[in-house]
Amino acid sequence: MATVDDILTGKYPAKSHARRVAQLLQAHHGQGAPGVIYLEAQKTRLIEDNDEPMPFRQRRFFYYLSGCSLPDSYLIYDINADKLTLFIPPIDAEEVIWSGLPLSADEAMKLYDVDCVLAATEVNATLRSIGSAYGGNAVAFAIADQVSSGAEFQGFAETKLSVLKEAIEKARVVKDEYEIALLRKANDISAKAHIAAIRASKTAVNEREIEGAFIATCIAHGAREQSYHPIVACGANGATLHYGKNDDDLTDPATKQRKNNILIDAGGEYRAYCSDITRVFPLGGSFTKETRQIYEIVLQMQLECIAMLKGDVQWEDVHAHAHRVAIKGLLALGILSGSEDELFEKRISVAFFPHGLGHYLGMDTHDTGGNPNYGDKDTMFKYLRVRGRLPVGSVITVEPGIYFCRFIIDPYTQSPELGKYINTTVLERYWMVGGVRIEDNIHITKDGHENLTTAPKAIEEMESLAL
């Protein structure tokens, strides 16, 4: 069986991606006229009022059909001829002085899964040639707001700007072997970074030191970019879902004691593919009684939900199951009172688990194709980023959590109808837990699933690493 590194020595499968997108276009928009797919890379841009370049992030639609991370590049896929052409920036003598020689066409041919590499100055001439070859009957597919003013589609019968984006988004949901290898690599690097962050917490005095340890480890192992801004939240900060300050002291100024625990939601990006991992660990080597109790519930939520995963499973059913496990656990602790079914019907668990169970993962952290319904009136499903059945080959996060956020819980406790279901006396002991979320990245297979995340999560492992 080929290893991850063996797979990644090959070329990114841009040509097969182009064919897949073309098939989706033809399936939904007819097999009639010949067509071309036209995509542009992200442009080089300067920071406003500055001569420094903005941090570069390649357009994901362009990358999916090229595997190319060069800015100011272009791509044309002639669907009928099955010819994929990449256009890269030509040599600029003045730029060479500052940045060195750019990638040559010959070098690009060796790197990328394309049929031809030309200079970016040849884009319009190539479009005219293709349009002429098809006698003016060809259709050009491009993405609105991602076409330069200088692009010329002369000789084409029509330019469609509203269908290509949707086709690529749909194609990206199902990953091939190469993409799974990239996601696995990103996860492996991030697992090392999570362990490094836990170890750094032993001597750290501020959240930013732990964030620094995570990022440094990612860079050292080849993941120079982060999938998203890391979340490093100590104590009650963990109750904020997308906490981003990462600058709080690990010692409580009132008690002069180290805070209970830290939630880290962070993932490195490897060759444009993301990881998204969340772990919670104790400061000082041992979870408090209350944090351990909540951790056990959340871990049970995650393990049971992962066990349900296989091709064609209904994601809403998995999400609902997570809520039922949460209700059962919070009932056992005395935080909730009532019957499991009544608490579920009243959506009381949403006060503690307000977000969706997970989202697709790929080149974007919240990857394409999830079809969310943020207008859903049902609070349990409103923020569920994926709706429907999970296809074989998709990769999804499973990230249940329980949070103690007054802003969310107080409206429930103060409600004449819902307040009776929450025991505020017992609840008082759990506010300083903040939040517990455990997140892994799961590859959906025909008969089951594969967990791409190797970072430790058992209570004993987390305490041992933090000791």
UniProtKB/Swiss-Prot annotation:
SUPFAM superfamilies, per database record: Creatinase/aminopeptidase (SSF55920), Creatinase/prolidase N-terminal domain (SSF53092)
Binding site for Mn(2+) 2: D265, D276, E439
Gene3D superfamilies tied to this protein: Creatinase/methionine aminopeptidase superfamily, Creatinase/prolidase N-terminal domain
GO biological process, one term: proteolysis
Binding site for Mn(2+) 1: D276, E399, E439
E.C. number: 3.4.11.9
Record field: transmembrane: none
Disulfide cysteine pairs (residue numbers): none
Keyword Magnesium carried by entry: no
GO MF, any single term: manganese ion binding
Cofactors: Mn(2+)
InterPro entries in the record: Aminopep_P_N, Creatin/AminoP/Spt16_N, Creatinase/aminopeptidase-like, Pept_M24, X-Pro_dipept-like
CDD domains noted in UniProt: Prolidase
Family from the record: Belongs to the peptidase M24B family.
Purpose: Catalyzes the removal of a penultimate prolyl residue from the N-termini of peptides.
Full protein name: Probable Xaa-Pro aminopeptidase pepP
Source species taxonomy: Eukaryota, Fungi, Dikarya, Ascomycota, Pezizomycotina
